[in-house]
Amino acid sequence: MNINATLLGQTVAFIIFVWFCMKFVWPPLMNAIEERQKRIADGLADADRAVKDLELAQAKATDQLKDAKATANEIIEQANKRKAQIVDEAKAEADAERAKIIAQGQAEIEAERNRVKEDLRKQVATLAIAGAEKILERSIDEAAHSDIVNKLVAEL
């Protein structure tokens, strides 16, 4: 092996080339690689954060859904209680109204019965007077004998 000037020139050129690459080419390449690694790491971290945020959002949505269901069930239960209360109040009002109408009807029936009895007494008294007139064959003056008529009506 001959070490001649060509080999020595090539070695010097190679060393200069390596120095030039290390000084001017290698740092931008390393910066680009490091920047790319950083972006990839940030992207992975963002993806992890997004997954965690998604899990938290799902948990929060589940909790809100449970709360909404509980609130809805509570509202439905209150509505059912209120419905039962309204139905009970309506039944009580209807019973009171029915009792009032029955009492009013009975009072009207009693008043009508008393009026009919009184009419009947008067008619019987009139018939009795007419019968007595025919029996006695004389006229009885109602004004003069009103006490007799009143006693007769009271007895009937």
Curated annotation (Swiss-Prot):
Record-linked SUPFAM superfamilies: F1F0 ATP synthase subunit B, membrane domain
Highest rank taxon of the organism: Bacteria
Membrane topology: Single-pass membrane protein
Keywords for this protein: ATP synthesis, Cell inner membrane, Cell membrane, CF(0), Hydrogen ion transport, Ion transport, Membrane, Transmembrane, Transmembrane helix, Transport
Subcellular location: Cell inner membrane
Transmembrane segments annotated in the record for this chain: 13-33
Signal peptide range in chain numbering: none
Keyword Ubl conjugation: no
Function: F(1)F(0) ATP synthase produces ATP from ADP in the presence of a proton or sodium gradient. F-type ATPases consist of two structural domains, F(1) containing the extramembraneous catalytic core and F(0) containing the membrane proton channel, linked together by a central stalk and a peripheral stalk. During catalysis, ATP synthesis in the catalytic domain of F(1) is coupled via a rotary mechanism of the central stalk subunits to proton translocation. Component of the F(0) channel, it forms part of the peripheral stalk, linking F(1) to F(0).
UniProt-listed HAMAP family: ATP_synth_b_bprime
PANTHER family associated with the record: ATP SYNTHASE SUBUNIT B, ATP SYNTHASE SUBUNIT B', CHLOROPLASTIC
This protein's name: ATP synthase subunit b
Lineage of origin: Bacteria, Pseudomonadati, Pseudomonadota, Gammaproteobacteria, Alteromonadales
Gene: atpF
